[in-house]
Amino acid sequence: MQFNPIIIGVAGGSASGKTSVAQAILQRVGADRIAHIDHDRYYKDLSHLPLEERARFNFDHPDALDNDLLVAHLDALCAGQAVDLPTYDYATYVRLPYTERIEPRPVILVEGILIFYEPVLRRRMHIKLFVDTDADLRFIRRLRRDIAERGRSVESVIEQYLATVRPMHLEFVEPTKRYADVIFPGGGRNPIAIDMVVARIEAALQSMA
């Protein structure tokens, strides 16, 4: 059975404010009507590598993500089937044995830095949003987040930013801005843009009713 949900993509650089935009949409549209998927859950398992090598892995390259699994999950949700989202441990760089089940909803909201890079993902999205934030602000946010939430040291965050995060953003993330239907300037704190997106979602949902 085809469920035909509306698929929304929220992209942007690391720590750009994607989650803030996603949460604003969830609050306005209603979490009971949205299946929320974070692309970060789909990082490939690195348990076969020594810990030091895992720490040097390029997580900002498209090949770091299991997009085949994400596509399979999107297609399953569109077919009215529940899916089990993977859980990733950012401290040890491995996929954990437990999952989180989500049920089909009228709206699927996917967020991640690279969700517009892969054509196979882009083609499935009805509304594409890009959160555009200054690089210095993104770095400060990332530094605070990785220290507080992921147990990282200041030195390791800076090293990773210079080695992979910044160059991969310029090569793979920034160019995908051209695919966006709406660009959120200033880190996503744009209530007018949120109003426009929510109105578009509500209109689409009414047309499906």
Curated annotation (Swiss-Prot):
Which GO annotations describe the biological process of this protein? Answer: CTP salvage; UMP salvage
**Gene Ontology MF term list:** ATP binding; cytidine kinase activity; uridine kinase activity
The record's annotation in SUPFAM superfamilies points to: P-loop containing nucleoside triphosphate hydrolases (SSF52540)
Question: GO CC annotation: what is one?
Answer: cytoplasm
What gene, per UniProt, encodes this protein? udk
Quote the protein name from its UniProt record: Uridine kinase
Transmembrane feature ranges: none
Q: According to the UniProt entry, what is the EC number of this protein? A: 2.7.1.48
